[in-house]
Regions:
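Alpha-helical cap/lid subdomain in secreted, periplasmic
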Residues: 1-199
């Protein structure tokens, strides 16, 4: 599959890679489960980065580090469903730091989700639905961090939404009505002063 992607005539402009949370779980005594030992996780992430870098000189890459978890919430919401949940906050930190270090060495943009989510004083109670999976509030933090990278990265062309040109601009009956009350105004390329949630 990876080879067919590499041979495709059109390569992705942006790839966001997010692994580490499940990998950081403790190994189950049965030998099954999602645990990936730290050295193997690092090597897998290195291979993913090298593959993505080989796709095209214009394919941009952002890795997301392993986020924190709320161990107490996991015990309260998931222990009855999955038995003993072998995941700790500290293990997530170790995998997060490993991802950040690898990305630094490979010159790949990486978002430190471990730190970003914990910037909120109430992160333990607002960032998760079950101690692991993101709530809408946590998802907003992730989007904000991704947009920050897109805005600040010195990529040519820039991939930040405000710098992208309008490719399919056309007049529409649904555009605002002009001052003459007979025509519409194409707002596709208007520079409007406003504050938007996703600046």
């Amino acid at each position: 599959m990876l080879q067919s992607i590499k041979e495709a005539s059109v390569q992705p402009a942006l790839v966001i890679v997010y692994f580490g949370g499940n990998d950081s779980m403790h190994p189950h005594p049965s030998g099954i489960g999602p645990h990936v030992p730290l050295p193997e996780y690092i090597e897998n992430m290195r291979k993913i980065a090298l593959h993505l870098k080989s796709l095209s000189p214009t394919t941009r890459i952002i890795f997301l580090s392993s986020p924190p978890i709320n161990e107490q919430q996991i015990k309260e919401t998931l222990s009855g469903k999955f038995g003993r949940v072998n995941r700790t906050h500290e293990d997530c930190r170790v995998y997060s730091e490993a991802c950040l270090q690898l990305c630094y060495e490979m010159d790949v943009n990486c978002i430190d989700l471990w730190t970003a989510l914990q910037q909120r004083d109430d992160w333990l109670t607002t960032c998760f639905t079950d101690g692991i999976h993101f709530s809408p509030e946590a998802s907003k933090i992730v989007v904000k961090e991704i947009l920050k990278v897109l805005r600040e990265a010195e990529w040519e062309p820039s991939l930040h939404w405000k710098s992208l040109s309008t490719e399919f601009s056309e007049d529409s009956l649904y555009d605002p009505i002009g001052p003459d009350a007979k025509t519409t105004i194409n707002v596709s390329d208007m520079d409007v002063e406003r504050h938007m949630q996703w600046e």
